[in-house]
Amino acid sequence: MNTVLGALNPIALRLGPIQVHWYGVIIASAVVIAVALAVREGQRRGVRPDDIYDMILWALPFTLIAARTYYVIFQWSYYRQNPGEIIRIWDGGIAIYGGLIGAGIVVILFCRSRFIPTWLMLDIAAPTVIMGQGIGRWGNFMNQEAFGRVTSLSFLQGLHLPDWLINQMYIRGAYRQPTFLYESVWDLLGFALLMLTRHRTHWYKQGDVFLTYVAWYAFGRFFTEGMRTDSLMLFNVIRVSQALSVVLFFGSIGLMIWRRHHNPNNRWYLAGSGQKVVAENK
C-alpha cells in the first residue's frame, strides 16, 4: 500500500439531525453479546437469568458514568475549559478502569441485596467483561484513538495487517502503533483462557476466575499502555493505567494465594454445585 487514503467514517448512520457513531454501535454490540453470555454462564452456575438482567440494568449506567468520570478527572485541565464536552461520550473518552470500578461497586451491592455470593457473580461476569473489552476496542479504532507511538509503514505491513486497518493507523501525519489491536487480541485470548479453564472446577475456588481475569488484563494493559501516546497522566509523570495495572496484577495474585491459605470457608467449585450454593445463600 503506497497511497494514504482518507480515514474510515466514524458515523455509521445519519437519520436527519441524528448521527449514529460506529463507536456506539460497537460498544452496544459488545454489551449485547456480553449479556447473552452472562445469562448462559449464570444458568450454568445456578444463578437465575432475572438476577443477571437486573444486575446488568443497574450496572450499565453506573459503569458508563464511572468510566466517563474517571476519564474527565484525569483530563480536568481540558474539561475545565470545555465543560460542555463532558457529556459528549459518543466522541470517545471513557476509561476502562473507571468502568470496572463502577461495575464492581454495583455488583457487590446488588449481590448483598439478593443474597447471592459476590465472588460467584464476579466469576460469572469475568469472561463476559473481558470479551466485551476486546470487542469494544474496535470502537477506539473507528475513532482513531487509543493509538501508540509513531511507527513505519513497513512495520505495519510486516504484521500482515489488511490495508484498511493500516490506513486507519495513519493519524496526525504519521503511521501509529495499533495498540487498540494489541489489547483487543490480548483480551480475546484472555476470554478464551477463562472459557477453557472454567470447566476445570477442581482448579478454582469462588473468585479465582475473576482474579485470574484481573491479573491477565492488568498484565497486558501495563505493556500496551506504555506504547500509547494518549495516556491519562498523574502529575504529568505517572501513567495512571500503568500504575493501577501493577497494583491490580500483584494484588489479584496475592489475594488469590491468601484466600487459598487463610480462607478455608471459601468454596471449591464442584460439578453441578452452582445451584446449591445460590440456594443455600438465599
Swiss-Prot record:
InterPro entries: Lgt. It holds the Pfam family LGT. One of its GO terms (cellular component) is plasma membrane. It is a multi-pass membrane protein. It is an enzyme of class 2 (transferase). Its EC number is 2.5.1.145. This is Phosphatidylglycerol--prolipoprotein diacylglyceryl transferase. The gene is lgt. It is found in: Cell membrane. HAMAP family: Lgt. Keywords: Cell membrane, Membrane, Transferase, Transmembrane, Transmembrane helix. It comes from Lactiplantibacillus plantarum (strain ATCC BAA-793 / NCIMB 8826 / WCFS1) (Lactobacillus plantarum). Its main location: membrane. One of its GO terms (molecular function) is phosphatidylglycerol-prolipoprotein diacylglyceryl transferase activity. Belongs to the Lgt family. The chain crosses the membrane at residues 18-38, 56-76, 89-109, 237-257. Pathway: Protein modification; lipoprotein biosynthesis (diacylglyceryl transfer). Catalyzes the transfer of the diacylglyceryl group from phosphatidylglycerol to the sulfhydryl group of the N-terminal cysteine of a prolipoprotein, the first step in the formation of mature lipoproteins.
